[in-house]
Amino acid sequence: MLEGAKLMGAGAATIALAGAAIGIGNVFSSLIHSVARNPSLAKQLFGYAILGFALTEAIALFALMMAFLISFVF
C-alpha cells in the first residue's frame, strides 16, 4: 500500500516536467518571433531567452529531485 502511494506521488511530481517542457518551448518560440520582428536586438533577446530557459529548467530539476526523493528516500 505504501509503495503504491510512493509511486503515485512520484508520478504526480513528474507532471511538472511536462509543464517545464511547454514553458521552454514558449521561451524559444517567443525568441524566434521577436528576432524575426527586430533582428537588431537578437543578441540582447538571446540573453533574455537563456535566462528564461535557465529559470524554467531549474523548476523542472526541482520537480525531478522531488520525484526521486519520494521514490527512493521516503
From Swiss-Prot:
The record's GO CC annotations read: mitochondrial membrane; proton-transporting ATP synthase complex; proton-transporting two-sector ATPase complex, proton-transporting domain
The domain of life is: Eukaryota
A Gene Ontology biological process annotation? Answer: proton motive force-driven ATP synthesis
- Membrane-crossing segments per the record: 8-28, 50-70
User: Which GO-annotated molecular functions does the record name?
Assistant: ATP binding; lipid binding; proton transmembrane transporter activity
- Subcellular location field: Mitochondrion membrane
Q: Respond yes or no to whether keyword Metal-binding is given for this record.
A: no
According to UniProt, residues marked as the site described as Reversibly protonated during proton transport are: 57
Keywords (A to Z) from UniProt: ATP-binding, CF(0), Hydrogen ion transport, Ion transport, Lipid-binding, Membrane, Mitochondrion, Nucleotide-binding, Transmembrane, Transmembrane helix, Transport
Q: Which InterPro entries match?
A: ATP_synth_F0_csu, ATP_synth_F0_csu_DDCD_BS, ATP_synth_F0_csu_sf, ATPase_proteolipid_c-like_dom, F/V-ATP_Csub_sf
Please state the protein's primary subcellular location: mitochondrion
Q: What is this protein called?
A: ATP synthase subunit 9, mitochondrial
Tell me what gene encodes this. Answer: ATP9
